């Protein structure tokens, strides 16, 4: 498996990163923060250590970053805090809600079931286009010279359930769309 490390510059360090006042007055900040919160909810983010959610200090592009997402999906419970595994914001981007409502179960399984595939050939390993899921019950799968990485069918079902919950709550009027 591969680990990637990328240093983020011009981001907040430490402390509470969610600024409710800014969220209510700056639509670009609100969009970035709401989209990140939707993602952390969908992936069942369970590592709220200080520094795992960062905001850009660039006022013209107030992006939000979530890092160290190793304790997600069906990971065992963590004592690291889980405040971002819930939707904490009250306003969501309409474009994001529309996109979530257009997703089908088939699309989720197709895109998330096999996220990466590798083949061993001639003493080398190469990234190749994903093929049919070898075993939907496992996240890491091997068959012959093929290795696949992706979410399990159970994890994808949990993602689908969380998306449907957001959409249901939206229909009930829980969120203001912008």
Name every feature range the model reports, one short phrase each.
Residues 1-178:
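Phosphate/dinucleotide-binding and metal-coordinating scaffold of catalytic cores
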């Amino acid at each position: 498996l591969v680990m990637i490390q990328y240093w983020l510059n011009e981001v907040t360090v430490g402390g509470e990163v969610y600024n409710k006042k800014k969220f209510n007055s700056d639509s670009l900040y609100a969009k970035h923060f709401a989209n990140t919160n939707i993602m952390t909810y969908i992936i069942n983010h369970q590592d709220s250590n200080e520094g795992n959610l960062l905001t850009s200090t660039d006022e013209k592009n107030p992006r939000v970053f979530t890092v160290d997402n190793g304790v997600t999906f069906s990971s065992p419970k963590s004592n690291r805090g889980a405040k971002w595994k819930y939707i904490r914001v009250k306003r969501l981007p309409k474009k994001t809600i529309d996109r979530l409502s257009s997703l089908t179960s088939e699309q989720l399984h197709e895109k998330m079931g096999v996220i990466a595939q590798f083949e061993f050939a001639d003493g080398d390993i190469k990234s190749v286009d994903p093929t049919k899921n070898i075993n939907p019950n496992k996240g890491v799968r091997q068959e012959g010279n093929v290795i696949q990485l992706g979410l399990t069918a159970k994890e994808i079902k949990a993602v689908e359930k969380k998306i449907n919950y957001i959409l249901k709550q939206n229909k009930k009027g829980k969120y203001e769309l912008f």
